[in-house]
Amino acid sequence: MLKYLTSFILILATNTESQPAAAQIKNTQIRMPCGSGIANYEHPSQYSFTTVNAKSSLVRQINFGAEGLKSGQLSLTFVGHSTFLIQSPENIRVITDYNDYFRADVQPDIVTMDVEGGSHSTNLISPNISYVLRGWTEALTLQRHDVTLKDVRVYNLPTNITDFGAGFSNFSSIFIIQSQGLCIAHMGHLRHILDQQQLTDIGRIDVLLIPIDRLVTQSHDELIHNIKAINPRPIIPMHFDGMPTAKTFLRDISGVYAVKRFGTHTMMLSRSTLPIKTEVLLLPPQRPGSRLRPRL
């Protein structure tokens, strides 16, 4: 009997491993967090981050192909609302909060959806997408992911957990994209102060994508508290579909961090060109507007 039971478990494990990528991963073994074992980096002495212009290596308009990317570089495009396209030198494309309203005109390899909602998720999934990572489960259980595809790793931290893990309130996830020595965190619909264990589980974060609308997310005071605890270099706002929302946030944070505005929605990232100190980089969305019709 024990022999048959062991065989059944092995078969079940094999079948689970070979499930389509769109199937939700419920018992993923989480590895070391982003940045573990990497010494604190130093910027080259000749590096100076004082101005942003069209010729800056940080703000280069690039094609969606990976031809312009070198080892150690990532491209990041603010598609709209909470959707970003992140692309690696091996042409792996990650799209955050994949939905039917704000979509890049490329086929992604990995998509994340931090919360269930019209502009944050979709059930219309191409079979060509390698991994579909949702930040929630219908059964209200913890959803953990940790996947690697070529030179890109994506993992998550469930958030908004109440009742000591027994229930959820607007259950969501922070998704971390790790590639080329960079760690990028998409904060999703985080609604609380992160504790020390959560900060440890997230790991070192170089680039932080933050919601600024205060509607179903953190207040600006809570947001600034979490930014200080995470200590990223660039902070890139999301969850704004018009300048009034952005202006309110910039007013609240300008006394804490320097603010730089960009004229392009795509930027090049590398560890050597990160700002020395934490600062806000405001990118215009590629597809602005909160009332777009679904792109099916």
Predicted regions and their residues:
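Short, structured coil segments at secondary-structure junctions
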Residues: 107, 230-231
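Metallo-beta-lactamase
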Residues: 19-159, 184-186, 206-210, 243, ...
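Residue-level signal for inorganic ion chemistry
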Residues: 235
